[in-house]
Amino acid sequence: MSEKTIVKKETNVDFKKPKMYKVILLNDDYTTMDFVVEILITVFHKTAADATRIMLDVHRKGKGVVGVYTYDIARSKIALVEKMAAEREFPLAAVMEPE
């Protein structure tokens, strides 16, 4: 019977944290406050109280950060906001910026 030798090689792997992006909701004159709160609760998983606070901040300042995510997650959340807004014929928009 032949002998088998197993050699284990130790590898050091450095993992970098992924780059993060702020998702920013933009205010407009047509989207209702109730719809913005609904978006914040359903898409961004905010509590009703947090959603209301963020919505008022966006309303007063013209824009507001709703969350910080990796690129792919931020992109998909923005796409979902745009899809839901279009279905209701609202011009609500969101953008992302590197953190």
Swiss-Prot record:
Record-linked InterPro entries: ClpS, ClpS_core, Ribosomal_bL12_C/ClpS-like
Pfam families registered for this protein in UniProt: ClpS
Single biological process term from Gene Ontology: proteolysis
Membrane-crossing residue ranges in chain numbering: none
PANTHER family listed in its UniProt record: ATP-DEPENDENT CLP PROTEASE ADAPTER PROTEIN CLPS (PTHR33473:SF19), ATP-DEPENDENT CLP PROTEASE ADAPTER PROTEIN CLPS1, CHLOROPLASTIC (PTHR33473)
Its job: Involved in the modulation of the specificity of the ClpAP-mediated ATP-dependent protein degradation.
Family: Belongs to the ClpS family.
HAMAP family linked to this entry: ClpS
Subunit structure: Binds to the N-terminal domain of the chaperone ClpA.
Protein name: ATP-dependent Clp protease adapter protein ClpS
Gene name linked to the record: clpS
